[in-house]
Amino acid sequence: MSGLTGDGNSRHCLCIVRKEGIQMSEKEIEVYGKQVDEIKIRPYEHHAKYYETDQMGIIHHSNYIKWMEEARMDLMDQIGLSYKEMEAMEIISPVLSVSCEYHSMVHFDDVVVIEPRITKYNGIKMEVEYRMTDKVTGELRTTGTSSHCFLNRSGRPISLKRSYPEIDTKFFEYTDI
């Protein structure tokens, strides 16, 4: 069964998928006929640096996109699909689009908790959503999305389902569907 630890309203917590035995409100998750025992994803934290601020004393808008990439790479590392390992297999994952909505300002020295989650995945493309909150107050700072595809080194689209089923399985396990 799937569920969240914490207050149930935010994703400030570990995302946990458990095998039978604990009653939770979310749907059962099966991955290619096998239940997932337990998956824990830590949120990514970023400590805002002075050089990331603009003339108004707040974090420049371009930095949020960089933070999203840092959080996505951390997520990939946690699920066992580091970019370095994928590139060694000659799989690249360029950004197709990115969007960011600013809800409240981040200042120098703030710590932002970034919770990325894979919301769409079909073996050829994926979409990641990001939620950034203040570590101390929990206030929502920013939300965003990025979409990506999978290409070989020649720049041709590849299907992970067909070419790399073990990688496809890992992506499927961590996709919120």
Explain the meaning of each model-derived region.
Residues 75-126:
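Hydrophobic beta-strand-centered segment that forms part of the acyl-chain substrate-binding groove
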Residues 11-23:
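Short, Lys/Arg-enriched N-terminal segments with co-localized hydrophobic residues
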Residues 46-50, 102, 150:
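Hydrophobic residues in beta-strands and at strand termini
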Residues 25-78:
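Catalytic strand-loop segment that frames the active site of acyl-thioester-processing enzymes
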Residues 25-44, 107-108, 119-177:
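HotDog/MaoC-like acyl-thioester-processing domains
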Residues 60-61, 69, 99, 103, ...:
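Anionic, Ser/Thr-rich low-complexity intrinsically disordered regions
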